[in-house]
Amino acid sequence: MPPQLRLNAVAFVSPQNHPILIRTFVQGPDELKYHYIAHTSLDVIDERSASEPPLTAAMSSKSTECYMNLLYTMEDVAVYGYMTPLKVKIIIALALTDAVVRDADVLTIFKALHTVYRQSVANPFLRLSAPIDGYNDNAALLAAGSPKWKAFRRRVDDIGKAVGAVAVTA
């Protein structure tokens, strides 16, 4: 990946639009700003996914179909979106630069983040202790801040460092 990319934040959002994990990689009091960016990105993602025709089974296997491109820019941040086939939304905020950001580089970041999430959820030893009430809300996934999700957060932090994040906030 080119060194000019700098990842400022990553957000994982459930299909019901509940934040699973919002991780910031900038120093300072900008954490609330990235929560705002994640929530406003949901409106753009919902609008784009509602306007697109439903995918056929043959087309839905492509990871590029999950990539939602540049959602918007705000101040010094470019926001990109990705929606998994199970409707989990991954949002990244990259620092704006004068350099060209290639879609292939952004898609590589999303594939890595999606793989980390998929591996964490598929861990058979991760007991989420969610009540079985028939409701299809992934409420147990909202506990990503709990110690059970330490490996998930660590892997997301590793991706942030590999992309070029400055520092990791707790």
Where is each model-derived feature located?
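Acidic, low-complexity cytosolic segments
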Residues: 1-8, 20-170
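Short, acidic, Ser/Thr-enriched surface-loop or helix-capping motifs
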Residues: 14
